[in-house]
Amino acid sequence: MSAFVTTASPTVPPKPLSLGVIFLTLYIDLIGFSIFFPVGPAMLEWYVKKEAGGGLLATLVARLQSLAHAAHASDLATGALFAGALGSVYSLMQFVFSPIWGARSDRVGRRPVLLLTIAGNAFSYLLLFFSGNFLLFFAGRIIGGIMGGNLAVAIAAVSDVTTRENRAKGMGIVGVAFGLGFLTGPAIGGLTAHLNLLDRWPGLAAYGVHPFSVPAAIALGLCLVNLLWIQARFRETLPPESRGRDLTLRERNPVHSLFQIPDPAIRRANLVGFVVTFGFSFFESIISFFTADALHYTPRDLTLIFINIGLVSIVTQGVLARRYVPKLGEKFSAVAGMTLIGVAFAGIGYAIGVAKSAPLLYLMLTLSTIGSGFANVAMSSLISLYAPAEEQGRVLGIYRSLGFLARALSPAVAGWLFFNSGGTVTFVVGSVILLGSALLGSGLPRPHK
């Protein structure tokens, strides 16, 4: 999500097969990102027990627990703080590599970059399958974060095969992939949490297989299918005549890239995207721990939450946003969506921490998901419309990179707030941040079509 009001992207007829492959790529990326959401507390508990008495994890958790006891915080609050730190590392890798993959795809094409990064993702899932110790799990998540920076490449490919007038509809397809991934990943994680391969084959523990290997195996299988499909069927979406130059090492630096955008509209859109992602990531960071602490939710209960979010997201981004964002305008849709998320976040904090009401929680989750759907489609359309054709990958890469930076910082901040002040305060702070993003978004320029 950025802003550039210069060269129009060429009118290229949509290629349904390529869009289908792009859709699957995004879908599987989101599965990998979200598959461990509902089992996060249980996984952390398992690793802590396994490595008790020694090792890096045991040392870190012991220090956090001593702080928790001094602050009268619960063990779940300690887990949320630690999980937030882990999530930050994953997203930090995406922040560093997203502009690199995006710019590289502008130079050599989308297809080779997608093949490389998806193969790397498959390797990360293989490591997770055999991550019987915490360091191997940590390495798998780092590699997954590096390769997960290919989201900007996939979205740039959508821009390649859609016209400017149909850009919102193309980004709606992206939104459906996000919604399905956010539905399927937690569902796989939650519904397979009880499938422990060690119960049937205990000897596999010697090879690093652990109680949570099944979700990783499923994600690995999906990733390999995706890799084979792209190898066999994906048609390059960026023709050689539309490709840009290769970037210097300095230009590939994500921090340097952020300060080399001359257009003030792009800079403002990047700021809006950073703020809204930072605020929204509070939800992803602590919802599992907050509901487990206040409502005693199990992984199966959390799976139902994520299924609800995924279904609403699919309908919103695949149907409602695709239809109404072009009519309402990208700017209005983005601001309205951010405002709705902000209001709903305050309601989520109240529903869980004060009212302890599941029906109210689901209502607020539905509203926040609708707002997020409109904001995501509208902002993705804006940044694509602002960017010149030969820099779609780079501009989208910078925008996504800022989003990943927000996701790198947000889990640690949200975990710290939850650790010190509880979930209700954390969601109220998130609400204020999101309403602030809506205020910033009101100053975005309208794109030329």
Could you say what each language-model-derived stretch is?
Residues 5-16, 235-272, 294:
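Juxtamembrane intracellular "pre-TM" segments in multi-pass secondary transporters
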Residues 39-80, 285-302:
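Short amphipathic helix-loop junctions that connect adjacent transmembrane helices
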Residues 95-134:
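Conserved MFS/SLC helix-loop-helix module at the cytosolic interface between two early adjacent transmembrane helices
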Residues 97-109, 316-330, 418:
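Helix-to-loop junctions at the C-terminal end of transmembrane segments
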Residues 109, 130-135, 296, 351-355:
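Helix-breaking motifs and short loop linkers at transmembrane-helix boundaries and internal kinks
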Residues 139-178:
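Cytoplasmic helix-loop-helix junction between adjacent transmembrane helices
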Residues 220-240, 440-444:
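C-terminal membrane-cytosol helix-exit motif in multi-pass small-molecule transporters
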Residues 331-379:
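C-terminal transmembrane helical hairpin of 12-TM major facilitator-type secondary transporters
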